[in-house]
Amino acid sequence: MEAETKTLPLENASILSEGSLQEGHRLWIGNLDPKITEYHLLRLLQKFGTVKQFDFLFHKSGALEGQPRGYCFVNFETKQEAEQAIQCLNGKLALSKKLVVRWAHAQVKRYDHNKNDKILPISLEPSSSTEPAQSNLSVTAKIKAIEAKLKMMAENPDAEYPAAPVYSYFKPPDKKRTTPYSRTAWKSRR
């Protein structure tokens, strides 16, 4: 009860108020030091309650392949445990960096018409809430509209704008060589 009467820093209070809109108990933890291990972070999170799921992300390819991405996701058993983790961990120093702890937001991926236009979450990242809403047209409908326009343009060419002449990049030489290239010809010109 004493923890409930405690005043929260303004930033943590606004983060916790966002939690009322969340359905799950999933948190995004960012600004992780590259030296922090999955094991140590999991041990730190278990102090706040039962961890149902923990996703520590690594680079899959490129120059940083196998190295941590600098953020992770954690699901707690209850909302109270998640809120306590936000209160205690947000802004705390972990190795050389201050942790950023937020409620995770579902990122939505739209599939094409052949897959029944299902809208499914592909991951939970904080950036997804800032993306503008996409139009309701499916990708296949847009492709079909563009193909129809191209077909119409091919059938009814515009006389006002003639087609550009085709340039041949591999133009055959005017003269065919009878002998192979020789450097001695360059030396004799000097």
Curated annotation (Swiss-Prot):
A UniProt-annotated Pfam family: RRM_1
UniProt KW RNA-binding keyword: yes
UniProt keyword list: RNA-binding
Example of a GO cellular component annotation carried by this entry: intercellular bridge
Residue span(s) of domain RRM: 25-106
Location of the region described as Disordered in the Swiss-Prot/TrEMBL record: 166-190
Domain of life, source organism: Eukaryota
Example of a GO MF term: RNA binding
Protein name from the UniProt record: Probable RNA-binding protein 18
Species: Bos taurus (Bovine)
